[in-house]
Amino acid sequence: MKKSLYTITLFIWAACLLSSCKNEVEDYFDKTASERMEQEIVKYRELLIKPQHGWVMEYYPGGMDQTFGGYALTVSFTANGYAVFRSVLEDDVNNSVSSFYALNKDMGATLNFDTYNEIFHYFSNPDIGDGGGEGKGLLGDYEFILDSGTESEIIMTGKKHKSTIRMHALQEPATEYLRKAKARMNSYLIIPAVSGLKGTFAGEPAEAEFITSQSYILTQGEESTTFSFMFTDKGTKLYAPIELNGKKIENLSWDEQKRAFTTPDGQTNLALVYDPKGLREDQLLGNYVFHYGNDKQIDVSIKKTKQRRHYYGRLTFHCKTQLQRT
């Protein structure tokens, strides 16, 4: 009798459990795709405006291979559709620019910055001379597919160039974060005439070829891989782990004193290869006389325009040249 009673009780419990699961499934699929999408939009609308100090955006332009490394941007969102951007590339990190943002529906929920913002759209403007030059620019995105979101982190993917962009809720005012990140970045960028890295990777000899200031080709033996990084308030952060010859490192730190990228275990130590007699970009600014051909010359002025960090120039003809400062 007891056995029969136990069996009946167990059967009833299992039936209730299955009924509960069924109701949950039915509740979910009772909603149309449009309704589920609207739920996602509402979720992200609430998340975006929640952090007191806004978000730090780990922004990687440079197309699918993140050729130009990453940059710290901060952005705060308002309930009435404004996004306020600041950038580590600004001479004064207190500078901010506001523009509209929108949450839209595509293959999923998307975050779009369609109205021009001088700070943010610098990375996606094809008409600037930086990066790949006019017509390409820095190959950055301004429309993103929202992949996941919590109160502390939002992960999204650029719609055109496919880089993963992460946003973390700031725990301090945006200007404080950017000030620290900028100081760390400048301690690296101030070093002139960098051509690469040399040392060890995971305990074995390795060297890296300079692509851009924050992107390298790392070679060890016959194998090679690329890696890109950015500067945060605490140091450097890789876009993705570096994997080479079966070894993998998740983090790479910039050692300002050693002028090297290292890991805590000491197994990776990649020191900068640079010309100590080289000139920094700020030392090249000024007015020059440009001599070419046998007896031709033209006045040239080298200037730094707002935000630009990459300098490219070309002539439309081959010639022997000489620059003389005036």
Language-model-detected regions and their locations in the chain:
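Bacterial N-terminal signal peptides that target proteins for export
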Residues: 1-9
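C-terminal motif of bacterial Sec signal peptides marking the signal peptidase cleavage site
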Residues: 16-20
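Acidic/polar, low-complexity intrinsically disordered N-terminal segments immediately downstream
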Residues: 22-110, 149, 161-163, 172-194, ...
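Hydrophilic extracytoplasmic domains
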Residues: 27-49, 249-326
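N-terminal glycine/threonine-rich, aromatic-flanked beta-hairpin/loop signature
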Residues: 64-108, 199-238, 296-326
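General beta-strand recognition
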Residues: 84, 110-112, 155, 217, ...
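Extended alpha-helical scaffolding regions
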Residues: 96, 155-226
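Beta-sheet ligand-binding and adhesion/scaffold domains
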Residues: 114-190, 236-283, 292-294, 326
